[in-house]
Swiss-Prot record:
Domain UvrD-like helicase C-terminal: 507-796
UvrD-like helicase ATP-binding domain residues: 9-480
Protein name: ATP-dependent helicase/nuclease subunit A
NCBIfam families per the UniProt record, alphabetical: addA_Gpos
SS bond list: none
Alphabetically ordered keywords of this record: ATP-binding, DNA damage, DNA repair, DNA-binding, Exonuclease, Helicase, Hydrolase, Isomerase, Nuclease, Nucleotide-binding
Family affiliation: Belongs to the helicase family. AddA subfamily.
PROSITE patterns referenced in this protein's UniProt entry, alphabetically: UVRD_HELICASE_ATP_BIND, UVRD_HELICASE_CTER
Cofactor(s) needed: Mg(2+)
Gene name of the record: addA
EC number annotated for this UniProt entry: 3.1.-.-, 5.6.2.4
Length: 1230
C-alpha cells in the first residue's frame, strides 16, 4: 500500500513515489538537478523513523560512488536524526540510531568489500593482516612477476611462445608483449569470471572451412556499420538530388545523382550478404558530373551538391578499405591462423595472473581489483551446473540488510553488479533501490557499464508490475528555463539509441522546477572564433586556439562583472551582483588550463585551478632525483650534468666544457675522474669536483646500510640544499616539495620494496602513469576567483555562470588506433601480424570492435557534454574555435537536413568534436536563419530555446584594443631593441636629461628604521666604537657546496640562550626571602615541566650565581620593596637625529622598543635593575676592575634609554639605576 503525500509537502509526486515506494526493486532515473541525494536521504530517514516498522540504520546497505559522498550521506542522515531527536527528546530508538550511525554500512562498494573480507577472510585463504597495496607498488610487483615469467618461457624454448613473441614484439625488446599481457589481465578483472572470459577469447577466431563471415559472433556490428554507411551515402545523394530541383540548382546533374542512388540501393539490398557485397562494391563507379556553367546556376548550390557527392564517394572508399580489400576467405584464413596465437596469449595471461596472485599473497597485500573479486568469491559458490549462487555469507547479508540502496548506479561495473545481486534479495522480494542518471554516465574509462542501468530501465515498468519499478525524476530545481530549453533543444537532436545509448524522449527531457526572478540576459551564448588557416602545425594551432578562447572568455567575464550581471542568491532570497566565484570554466581535460590561467591573469581576472601537476618538474625535486640516480649509477650523463650544473656543485657551462674536453668519448663520470687525475686542471674547479666526488662515495656507502628516506635526509644535511631552496623565490613551497619527496620515500619503505634502484623505478612508474603530487596553490577554493576544472570534476556541482570551452578540440580516439582492442562483450580483437614479413592488417574482429568502441566513445562524449551544460544555473556560454566559417556552416547545413528531431545516426557517428554535435543542431534553430538554416519542421524551429551566436575573428581578440599611441610605443621599443635611432627623440631630450640627473631628496631618511629596539641600538653603538662605521653586514667568501650558517653549527647553548634562561628564572623566583638551594632547584624543575626552560637550559644555570644575587645590597632591597614589576615592556618615540646623529636630514620620528628586567619601588624611590650574563672572569685581564669601563660604555645607551622611559612613565626621577653581573656577583651603578 502506497503512503499518500502529506498536505503542504514540497516533494513532487515523483519524488514522493521514490521516497515511499517499496516491495520491489526500484530504479530511479534522476535527471540533473532533480534532488536525487535529498530523495535518497529522505527515504533512509523515513525507514529509520517509521512509526510502525522502524529499521535500524545498520540494517541498510548504502553504496556511494566516492568516500566524500559517503561522508556527506552520513552527515545528512546524522543531521536529520538530530532534528528528529530534538522534536522527540525521549526517543530511545533515535538515540540508538545516532549511536549506530558510525558503524552503519554507508560507504563505497570497495569499503563494503573490505568489510566482508575482514569478516570472512578464512573462507578464501587470505592473511587476516593483509593491507591494500599502493598502486605503484602493485605495478612494480607485477613487472617483476612478468619478467620472471618471460625469462622462464625463453628458457623453455616453447615454439608457441616464440611465435607469439615474433608477432607482438619489435627487434629491440619485448615490452609491447609484456604490456599486452598486463593489459589483457587487467581488463579481464572487470568481468565477474575473469578466467571464463579469458578462455572465451579464442572462440572469436573460430572459423571452420565452411564458416560464413555472416555467422561469426561479431558480425552484427559489422553489418550495422555497413548499413549505417550505406544509409549515410544514400541520404547525401538524396540531398544532392533535391538540390537539383531548387531554383539555381545543378539540374543537369540530376541524372548523375539518380545513377549513383541506383548503385547504392543495389548495395543496400545485399547488405546482409557479406560475400555479395564483396562482389558488388568494387563495381560501383561514379560517372563524371555533367557541366553546370552559366548564370542560371547558383554556385553555392552547385558546390554543395558536388560536396555531398564527394563525401559519399569517400565513404564508399572507406567501406572498401575496411571490409572489402580482401576476400571473405582471406578474412577467415586470417582468423584461423591467429587462433592458436590467441590461445597461447590466453595461457600466458592465465599463468601471469596465477603467479601475480601468489606474489601478492606472499606479501599479504591486495589491490582494489582483489577487493571486489575476493568479496565475490566469499559471497558466491558454484552450483552443480557451474553457476554462481549465493553462499552462506551472502545469505547472512541478505538477512542482515533490510534494503540495499545504490547511488550513481549508472557508474556500476559488472563485478559490482554481481556483488549487489548476491547481497540483495531476489527480484520478487524486491529490496534493491537504485538511483542514477544514465545520461550522466561518464566513467566508461573506469569500466563502468551504463547498459546495466539501461537494461533495467527498459525492463522495469512505471507501476512495478514487471520485475521492478522505474521512477523518472525529470524536474530540474537547479537551472533557469533558458538553460533547460537550450539543453533539451540540443539533446533531442543528438542523443539517441545508436549514438548516446539512450533515447532523449519526453521522459528524459528536463522540466523546470526552479523559480527565478525574470532576467532577459540569460539566453545561451555560443562564442565561435574563426582562426586563421595555415597555422604552422597542430601544436601551434592548439596554442592559438586556447589563447583566443581564453581571451574571448576573459572579455565576457569582464563584461559580466562591469555590467553587474544579476545572479539569484537562494539564501538571501534576492538578486545580487555577480562575483568571480560565481563563474566556472569547464574543460574536457586540463592541458589547456595553464594557458587559460595565464591569459586571465594578464587580463586582471583572478583564477583558480586545482592543477595536480608540476611536482616532478620542480627544479629542486628534479635535481634531488638526479642526485639519487647518480648515487645508484654514476654513469648516467644527463643526471650527472644536471647535478654538476645545479647549486649543489655550482659549475657553469665553461667548467662543464673543461671536464668534457678531458675525455670527449667516455661517459661524463669518467671525464670527471680524468679531470681530477690531471695535474693541469683549474685548482678551484678541481677542489669542487674533489669535494663532490667524496660526497658521492660517502652517499653510495651510506645507501647500502640505510633506507632511501634516510639517504635523502643525509643528502639534505650534507648539501644544505633544503636550507638553500628556502632562500629562493617560493622558498617555503620548494622546501615543502623536498620534504614531500622524503615522505614519499618513507611511504615507499612501508611497502614490500626496498632499495634505491627500486625507489627510482617506483618514481618513474608514477611519472609514466601521470601521477603527480602537485604543487601548493596560492589561492584557496573559498576565494573570489573564477574556477577552472574538468567536466568530470564538476559532476554533482553547480555554478551560476558556466563557460564550456574547447568545443572545437578533437575527441581523443587514439586508443582506437592500437594494434589490438579489448571489449567486455566481444573479447580481444587484433591485427593479423605476419611473423616473418612483419606485414600487418586489421582482422574482422578488430574492425568490429573499433566500430563498436567508437560508437561507445561518442556516446560517452555526448554524456560528458550533457553534464557540462547541466552545471549552469543562470547563464551558459559555449566556446569553440573553427577554421573556415563558410565551409563549416555549409557542412552544418548539410548535416542538419531532415524532418526528424533526431539528427541522422550516420552524421552523428562522424563527429570529431563537440562542435560537430552542436553546430548541425543549432543550424535548425530560428536564431540561425541568417546563416542559411535548412528547412525543418515548425516544432524544431519554434522551440522556446534562446541562443545568441557570435562569430569572432582573431583580430577581434587582441588583448584589449591597441590604440594608435600604443602601436607607436611598440614600434619605438622595437627600434630601441634593434639599436636604431628614434625619430623625434630631440623633443624629449631635455626632459630625459633632467630625469636622469634627478636625485632623491630624502636619501638619509631611507637609511632610518622607523622602529628600533634598545638592544639593536646598543649593538649599533658597539660597532661604531669598534669599527668606526655602521656596516653591520659584510660580504662573505664564496664556498663550495653550501656552508652551514654559524647559528646552525653552534654546539650546546649560545650566550644569548644562557642569558634568556637566567632572565626566565629571575622573572619567576619568589621575592619574599632569600631562597634555599633546594627550593631553587625545585623551582627550576617546575619551569622545565611547564616548558618555560629546556633541559639544556636547566643544566646551564649556575644556581650559586642566582643565590649570590640575594646577598647583595640591591638584592636585599627587593625583599623590602613596596612594589616589584618584572619584564616591563615600553615604547617610546625619539627623533631620528637622537638615534642617528650623523645623518643630516633625519628628522623622522623613530619608535624605540625595549623590556626592563626589573623596576621596584622602596620608601626612598624607584630603582631600575637589569641583569647581565656577560663573561668577565678569564676574559678581562684585571677582572671586574678592568672590565668596568668597557661594560659601562657598552650599556650606557641602554640604561639611559630605560631611565628616560621609566621617568616618563612615573613622572619623577629614578633613585637608582644598576646592572647586576651574575659572573662574579658585581653591581654596576649609573
Amino acid at each position: 500500500m502506497e503512503i499518500s503525500k502529506p498536505k503542504g509537502s514540497t516533494w513532487t509526486d515523483d519524488q514522493w513515489k521514490a521516497i515511499v515506494s517499496s516491495g520491489r526493486d526500484i530504479l530511479v532515473a534522476a535527471a540533473a538537478g532533480s534532488g536525487k541525494t535529498a530523495v535518497l536521504v529522505e527515504r533512509i530517514i523515513r525507514k529509520i523513523t517509521d512509526q510502525e516498522r522502524p529499521v535500524d540504520v545498520d540494517r541498510l546497505l548504502v553504496v556511494t560512488f566516492t568516500n566524500a559522498s559517503a561522508a556527506e550521506m552520513k552527515h545528512r542522515i546524522g543531521e536529520a536524526l538530530e532534528k528528529e531527536l530534538a522534536e522527540n527528546p525521549g526517543s530511545l530508538h533515535l538515540r540508538r540510531q545516532l549511536a549506530l550511525l558510525n558503524k552503519a554500512s554507508i560507504s563505497t562498494l570497495h569499503s563494503f568489500c573490505l568489510q566482508v573480507i575482514r569478516k570472512y577472510y578464512y573462507l578464501i585463504d587470505v592473511d587476516p593482516a593483509f593491507r591494500i597495496a599502493d598502486q605503484t607498488e602493485g605495478e612494480l610487483l607485477g613487472d617483476e612477476v612478468l619478467d620472471e615469467l618471460f625469462e622462464e618461457e625463453y628458457k623453455k624454448g616453447n615454439p608457441a611462445f616464440f611465435e607469439l613473441v615474433d608477432r607482438y614484439t619489435t627487434d629491440r625488446h619485448d615490452l609491447d608483449l609484456q604490456h599486452l599481457v598486463k593489459r589483457v589481465y587487467e581488463f579481464s578483472r572487470s568481468h565477474p569470471d575473469p578466467e571464463g572470459w579469458l578462455h572465451s577469447l579464442a572462440e572469436l577466431y573460430d572459423a571452420a572451412s565452411d564458416t560464413k563471415v555472416e555467422a561469426l559472433p561479431f558480425y552484427s556490428y559489422i553489418k550495422e556499420d555497413i548499413a549505417l554507411v550505406l544509409e549515410g551515402m544514400r541520404q547525401k545523394l538524396t540531398r544532392a538530388l533535391d538540390l537539383t530541383k531548387q531554383p539555381g540548382g545543378p539540374a543537369p546533374r540530376a541524372e548523375n545523382f539518380l545513377d549513383d542512388l541506383a548503385q547504392i540501393d543495389r548495395l543496400i539490398q545485399q547488405q546482409d550478404d557479406f560475400s555479395a557485397l564483396h562482389e558488388l562494391v568494387p563495381t560501383v563507379s561514379f560517372q563524371r558530373l555533367k557541366p553546370c556553367k552559366g548564370d542560371e546556376y547558383d554556385p553555392r548550390l552547385v558546390d554543395e551538391a558536388a560536396d555531398l557527392r564527394n563525401s559519399a564517394k569517400k565513404q564508399l572508399e572507406k567501406l572498401k578499405s575496411d571490409y572489402f580489400s580482401r576476400t571473405p576467405e582471406q578474412h577467415l584464413e586470417s582468423l584461423r591462423e591467429m587462433k592458436p596465437v590467441i590461445q597461447t596469449l590466453v595461457q600466458l595471461v592465465l599463468e601471469y595472473g596465477r603467479r601475480f596472485a601468489e606474489a601478492k599473497k606472499e606479501k599479504a597485500i591486495v589491490d582494489f581489483s582483489d577487493l571486489e573479486h575476493d568479496c565475490l568469491a566469499i559471497l558466491s559458490v558454484k552450483n552443480p551446473a557451474g553457476e554462481a549462487v549465493p553462499s552462506e555469507a551472502a545469505k547472512f547479508y541478505r538477512h542482515q540488510f533490510h534494503e540495499v540502496l545504490v547511488d550513481e548506479y549508472q557508474d556500476t561495473n559488472l563485478v559490482q553488479e554481481a556483488i549487489l545481486k548476491l547481497v540483495a534479495k531476489e527480484e520478487h522480494e524486491g529490496n534493491l533501490f537504485m538511483v542514477g542518471d544514465v545520461k550522466q554516465s561518464i566513467y566508461r574509462f573506469r569500466l563502468a557499464e551504463p547498459l546495466l542501468f539501461l537494461s533495467k530501465y527498459k525492463r522495469f515498468t512505471d507501476d512495478g508490475s514487471g520485475s521492478g519499478q522505474k521512477i523518472d525524476l525529470n524536474k530540474n530545481f537547479r537551472s533557469r528555463s533558458d538553460i533547460l530549453d537550450s539543453t533539451n533543444f540540443l539533446f533531442k537532436q543528438l542523443m539517441g539509441e545508436k549514438v548516446g545509448e539512450v533515447e532523449y524522449d519526453e521522459q528524459a527531457e528536463l522540466k523546470l522546477g526552479a523559480s527565478y526572478p525574470p532576467n532577459e540576459a540569460t539566453k545561451t551564448e555560443l562564442l565561435l572564433i574563426e582562426t586563421p588557416s595555415g597555422a604552422p602545425g597542430e601544436e601551434a594551432e592548439e596554442l592559438e586556439a586556447v589563447q583566443l578562447e581564453a581571451r574571448a572568455m576573459a572579455g565576457q567575464i569582464r563584461r559580466l562583472i562591469t555590467e553587474k550581471f544579476q545572479v539569484y542568491d537562494a539564501k538571501a532570497k534576492a538578486s545580487r551582483n555577480i562575483q568571480y566565484r560565481d563563474i566556472v570554466v569547464l574543460l574536457r581535460s586540463m592541458p589547456w588550463a595553464p594557458q587559460i590561467m595565464d591569459e586571465f591573469k594578464q587580463q586582471g581576472i583572478p583564477v583558480y585551478a586545482n592543477l595536480s601537476t608540476g611536482y616532478f618538474e620542480a627544479t629542486e625535486v628534479s635535481v634531488t632525483l638526479s642526485l639519487l640516480k647518480i648515487i645508484d649509477n654514476a654513469y648516467q650523463d644527463i643526471p650527472l650534468a644536471s647535478v654538476l650544473r645545479s647549486p649543489v656543485v655550482g659549475l657553469d657551462e665553461n667548467e662543464l666544457s673543461l671536464i668534457r674536453i678531458k675525455d670527449k668519448k667516455a661517459p661524463f663520470y669518467e671525464a670527471m675522474k680524468a679531470y681530477l687525475a690531471a695535474a693541469d686542471g683549474d685548482e678551484r674547479l678541481s677542489e669542487k669536483l674533489r669535494r663532490f666526488d667524496g660526497l658521492l662515495k660517502k652517499w653510495r656507502a651510506y645507501a647500502k646500510n640505510h633506507s632511501v628516506a634516510e639517504l635523502i635526509w643525509e643528502i639534505y644535511r650534507d648539501t644544505k640544499y633544503l636550507d638553500y631552496v628556502g632562500g629562493m623565490p617560493g622558498g617555503k613551497q620548494r622546501q615543502a616539495n623536498l620534504r614531500a619527496l622524503y615522505d614519499r620515500a618513507r611511504s615507499y619503505e612501508a611497502t614490500s620494496f626496498r632499495g634505491l634502484f627500486r625507489f627510482l623505478r617506483f618514481i618513474e612508474r608514477m611519472q609514466e602513469r601521470g601521477d603527480d603530487l602537485g604543487t601548493a596553490r596560492a589561492l584557496s577554493e573559498q576565494e573570489d576567483v573564477v574556477r577552472l576544472m574538468t567536466i568530470h570534476s564538476s559532476k554533482g556541482l553547480e555554478f551560476p555562470v558556466v563557460f564550456t570551452a574547447g568545443l572545437g578540440r578533437n575527441f581523443n580516439m587514439m586508443d582506437l588506433n592500437k594494434s589490438y582492442l579489448l571489449d567486455k562483450e566481444l573479447g580481444f580483437g587484433t591485427k593479423f601480424i605476419h611473423p616473418k614479413w612483419r606485414i600487418s592488417y586489421p582482422t574482422l574482429p578488430l574492425i568490429a570492435m573499433k566500430k563498436k568502441l567508437r560508437r561507445e566513445l561518442l556516446s560517452e562524449e555526448l554524456r560528458v557534454l550533457y553534464v557540462a551544460l547541466t552545471r549552469a544555473k543562470e547563464k551558459l556560454y559555449l566556446v569553440g574555435t573553427a577554421k573556415d566559417k563558410e565551409k563549416l556552416l555549409a557542412d552544418w547545413r548539410t548535416q542538419a537536413a531532415g524532418s526528424e528531431w533526431l539528427l541522422p545516426d550516420y552524421e552523428r557517428f562522424q563527429a570529431k568534436s563537440y562542435l560537430d554535435f552542436i553546430g548541425p543542431a543549432l543550424m535548425r534553430h530560428r536564431d540561425m536563419d541568417e546563416s542559411g538554416a535548412p528547412p525543418v519542421i515548425d516544432e524544431i524551429r519554434e522551440h522556446p530555446a534562446r541562443f545568441q551566436v557570435s562569430w569572432l575573428s582573431a583580430a577581434d581578440l587582441q588583448a584589449e584594443a591597441v590604440d594608435q599611441a600604443g602601436e607607436e610605443r611598440h614600434d619605438r621599443l622595437v627600434q630601441i631593441q634593434m639599436g636604431h635611432a628614434i625619430e623625434g627623440a630631440f623633443e624629449y631630450e631635455q626632459q630625459v636629461r633632467e630625469r636622469l640627473a634627478w636625485s632623491y631628496p630624502y636619501k638619509d631618511a631611507a637609511k632610518v628604521r622607523t622602529k628600533q629596539s634598545v638592544s639593536e641600538m646598543k649593538r649599533q653603538k658597539e660597532y661604531e666604537d669598534e669599527y668606526g662605521d655602521r656596516s653591520l653586514i659584510r660580504p662573505s667568501q664564496e664556498a663550495l657546496l653550501f656552508k652551514r650558517p654559524s647559528f646552525m653549527m653552534a654546539k650546546g647553548l649560545t650566550a644569548a640562550e644562557r642569558g634568556t634562561a637566567m632572565h626566565t628564572v629571575m622573572q619567576h623566583i619568589p621575592l619574599t626571602r632569600t631562597p634555599e638551594k633546594n627550593e631553587l632547584s625545585r623551582l627550576l624543575d617546575r619551569l622545565v615541566e611547564k616548558e618555560l626552560l629546556t633541559e639544556d637550559q636547566r643544566a646551564a644555570i649556575e644556581e650559586d650565581d642566582i643565590l649570590a644575587f640575594f646577598d647583595t645590597e640591591i638584592g636585599q632591597k627587593l625583599f623590602g620593596a613596596r612594589r616589584v614589576e618584572r619584564e616591563v615592556p615600553f615604547n617610546m618615540t625619539l627623533s631620528a637625529k637622537e638615534v642617528y646623529p650623523d645623518l643630516e636630514s633625519a628628522d623622522e620620528p623613530v619608535l624605540i622598543q625595549g623590556i626592563i628586567d626589573c623596576l621596584f619601588e622602596t620608601e626612598d624611590g624607584f630603582y631600575l635593575l637589569d641583569y647581565k650574563t656577560d663573561r668577565i672572569h678569564g676574559k678581562y685581564r684585571n677582572g671586574f676592575e678592568g672590565a668596568e669601563p668597557i661594560l659601562r660604555k657598552r650599556y650606557e645607551t641602554q640604561i639611559q634609554l630605560y631611565a628616560r622611559a621609566v621617568e616618563t612613565m612615573i613622572k619623577m626621577p629614578l633613585k637608582g639605576r644598576a646592572l647586576y653581573f651574575f659572573d662574579g656577583g658585581h653591581v654596576l651603578l649609573f
